[in-house]
């Protein structure tokens, strides 16, 4: 992991702008407003101290700069409006950039990426405006940054579902707007129709979806709300949320190839600009039970293996369950997006990435269909030998299906010294099962957390093999969404 991206560096709880009437209950606007980036510095100081760099997401709008007081739907209620005064926003952005340069040095800040906003294509959720509004916001922001330091990299449009890229790049070229890279997001299932942006004004399809979302969120009657939430389970919030949100990937038939299909299209639409998927993962539904299972591990491994040579960088959303879009859940396992729980317990997807991080730099060409099917494999070479990543990936956790036998055969000049494997399956690297087996303690005490970590940590175990006729042969049985790493030591 080299860079960290997060929402809300300009949210009001970061205290970047305060007026006198925020401090004292003065019933008027005094015009006394101060700007401070002290808490922004605290966040970036910690990242740099950990050996990482920020991928700066410029979001959201400080209330004192906002055109309206319209808040996003999530728990932290960001202001999602355009600025009421372009010049005030420009001055604010330039003050921020100058602060960063003064604190960290010009060369350091020039090594960062600055991404304008987050998912402006999602009305009600993240942006109160049109696509044209966002393009204007991007233009004034990018120009403001470049006026301070033309070497600082800035990009967008940071959309969901691989959208707006073609029209965004066309806008920047037509109006000579600075853009150094393209960003977008993609979760499985959004949008199922693929990339719809054709470079012109908002399509009728996209406009209809946006308007329907606004209508649905803004004009729900009190009676409909009462009916929707009449029979919620009482007590904890998590069961209540799950009762009406559910797990779409278990409920619906969602294809597994939307990201793999859309990324090459976006790469072409970017017209040579670097492409970064700054958010992606298996499921976009926070609280879905499957987010804590090995289903995410299998999907992410398959996707990474398919796209490593297509895009320039990506960020799985997100690193930790310390994440408050739907409030800080008390349950240790609550379907969060994180690779780790709030207590630092590693989930199956963490171990899957650890497997990938441990393979050699040279990847063998096994053919185009090696990873396209339910059972797939990739092989790598290092000085120590050969590593094979195997997976059995399905969008649903059909754990009652019989295991699939996978036989591996590799040509080698001599018998290997040893063969061992690491595996993610029902009994290995499965902290959710350990937690549930101990009674699902809401907040595990230190001793319980230590047990979960110990019993679910990834372990190497010897794998029997046969060497004959210049080939080493072995076999494994893969359950649904299992991931194996086989290491053949020369």
Which stretches of residues belong to each language-model region?
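Active-site-proximal cofactor/substrate-binding loop regions of enzyme domains
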Residues: 182, 255-266
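Substrate-binding cleft and catalytic face of glycoside hydrolase catalytic domains
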Residues: 2-252, 285
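Mature N-terminal, pre-catalytic/accessory segment of carbohydrate-active enzymes
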Residues: 1-2, 6-7, 480, 490
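Aromatic/acidic polysaccharide-binding cleft in carbohydrate-active enzymes
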Residues: 277-401
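Carbohydrate-binding surface patches
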Residues: 372-439, 480-487
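C-terminal beta-strand-rich structural cap/linker in extracellular carbohydrate-active enzymes
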Residues: 443-490
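A structural motif corresponding to the C-terminal end of an alpha-helix
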Residues: 42-53, 99-108, 141-152, 262-275, ...
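Substrate-binding clefts and catalytic carboxylate motifs of secreted carbohydrate-active enzymes
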Residues: 287-326, 414-454
